[in-house]
């Protein structure tokens, strides 16, 4: 209604309305407000693999003076995963992809078979891997290590090489939570009334 006389905005407003309406239907009606159950369903069908992460995203190498803290990060994550998915996770995305020798033993003790680490953790391994970052390598414990793919990461994060800086995309930092008059947007903000992103973005990327 607000943008009906502004066709360049109204088209996007209609798109957002349809998108949010469908998202609400999928969440509230189709999956009964239980997204984890939906992920479990597709994992049980063999359509995807859900892995875990550190319980509180603790940076494991900086905890190496307290192995019990490291173990807790892993074991609590495994227990929480098992509670929701009915089995232990096979893999883990290490917090910040940070690895040091010995972490693989803790993962093995928890029943985890593979982990994700940084690209250079694979590329500069000893001995150097034959296939670089394009295949997993195995630790002495038998736990596999996969390197984070840098090209995929650049597509998501880089303002120069990826879509965050491509003029064909909407600007993440231009949001109606900040662009619209405060009195209009206030009912859609949190209780404290502070402006924040609400997820509706009308402007394309035009520069840095």
Model-derived segments and their meaning:
Residues 1-64, 69, 126-208:
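Active-site cores of enzymes that catalyze phosphoryl transfer or operate on phosphate-rich substrates
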Residues 36-40, 74-78, 104:
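Generic structural signal for well-ordered alpha-helices
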Residues 47-51, 88-91, 104-107, 111-118, ...:
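Beta-sheet entry/capping signal
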Residues 54-56, 91-100, 120:
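Short, solvent-exposed turn/loop segments enriched in Gly/Ser/Thr/Pro and often Arg
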Residues 59, 112-125:
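His/Asp/Glu-enriched short active-site or ligand-binding loop at hydrolase and phosphoryl-transfer sites
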Residues 67-94, 208:
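CE4/NodB-like, metal-dependent polysaccharide N-deacetylase domain
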Residues 75-79, 116-119, 139-141, 169-173:
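Glycine-rich loops and low-complexity Gly/Arg-rich segments
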Residues 83, 97-113, 128-131, 142:
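Hydrophobic, small-residue-rich alpha-helical packing segments that form membrane-like cores
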